[in-house]
Amino acid sequence: MVYRWDCRHCAFSAWSNSDERLRKNAGAHLFDHHSSKLSKADFRVAWDCPYCDAGETAHDKGAAAQAFKDHLDWHAGNSIESNAHLADEVENSGNVLVQTAADSAAADSARLQFTARSDLSIIVTKSPKERLRLLHDRFNGWPDRTVVMTTKRRPLAGAFDIDLSDAPVEVVELDRRLGPSQLGETISRVIDAHHTPDQRLAVGFDILYDIVSSFDLQTTHDFVSMLSSRLSEADALWHIYAEPRPQLSTALNVLEEYIDLTVETESGVFVVNG
């Protein structure tokens, strides 16, 4: 189950698979909006709730602030929606940048949300076994078709106990010498081979940082521009994972025009600001 909370005062939205984590995150956000309601009166600190008649006065400022935060947590919890998905924010198509490390629990949680409704899932990754294990362990069944594309040599060699013999899964080992243009063409060919207009397509992409760090900015821009256009034609959901770091900042500024939604992560909660 995925839960969602929207702020009534600004464009902040948050999602989590934990109702409690989301409630605390939303309550902290409300406290930022209403911290002025915490004021000093005589020798004590008082707060008045902006949503109801509740209030409290205490000598200890920290205790008063915590009581106010706890109360706002309660209000936030009353407006949490259930059975929500990040993909709803872009109506299951478009380009989503998730600002977290590709190999992280937060990324896995996002992957599950973006892949859950897909008929065809394409995954471009350096960690093929981990991506397949996630889908195998967390879904009741595979998407109609899953294609994993990776530069990892012998991608399923070693400890891997999942039987894929009857699974609708294809693993494509890419030549490490491929440039962004050739990679984009390969993805396009996979779409041509497996996608039909009535299917929902999700493309997971773990290697943006590798492209940015290996090629110049113009090459990166051209790759993202062309692949974005190709995926838009297929009405695809492109979910991209990149941990914020200085080496990426310039590239992300240039690529911003192709990103429909940027998602941040905060202790198990996905956050969108505007």
Question: What feature does the model see in each segment?
Answer:
Residues 4, 44-46:
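Residues immediately within or flanking Cys/His clusters that coordinate Zn2+
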Residues 79-139:
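Glycine-rich P-loop/Walker A and Walker A-like loops and their local beta1-loop-alpha1 context
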Residues 240-274:
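Phosphate-binding/switch region of NTP-binding enzymes
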